């Protein structure tokens, strides 16, 4: 049975989160947290979402955001997740070893 579509309407306020695949660590050192913050800022320049707050933990992160266009939260989450995964694989030389994130958002 397929998963029901996620809510992603313009103007809504959402708590989104994502965690490491198998709850693995995705931020190993301070530089990883800083790189992800840069990814967030770049994503905000590309996608029409407002970010109200965020919390980064070693194996997951939380975002409170509002999409300004229907469907934009999903595009934003996909972009930051994919960009972080590419950076992670490049930095830690794990390319080809599978997904880094579990792709969860509410």
Ranges and model annotations:
Residues 2-13, 17-58, 64-71, 75, ...:
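An N-terminal domain-cap segment
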Residues 48, 90-92:
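A short, aromatic/hydrophobic, helix- or strand-capping loop or linear motif
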Residues 104-106:
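Conserved small/polar residues in nucleotide/adenosyl-binding loops
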């Amino acid at each position: 049975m397929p998963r029901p579509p996620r809510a992603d309407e313009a103007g809504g306020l959402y708590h989104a989160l994502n965690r490491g695949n198998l709850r693995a660590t995705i931020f190993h050192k301070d530089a990883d947290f800083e790189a992800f913050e840069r990814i967030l800022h770049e994503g905000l320049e590309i996608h029409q979402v407002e970010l109200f707050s965020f919390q980064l933990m070693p194996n997951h992160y939380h975002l409170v955001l509002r999409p300004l266009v229907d469907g934009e939260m999903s595009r934003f989450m996909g972009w930051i997740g994919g960009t972080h995964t590419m950076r992670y694989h490049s930095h830690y030389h794990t390319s080809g070893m599978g997904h880094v994130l579990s792709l969860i958002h509410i």
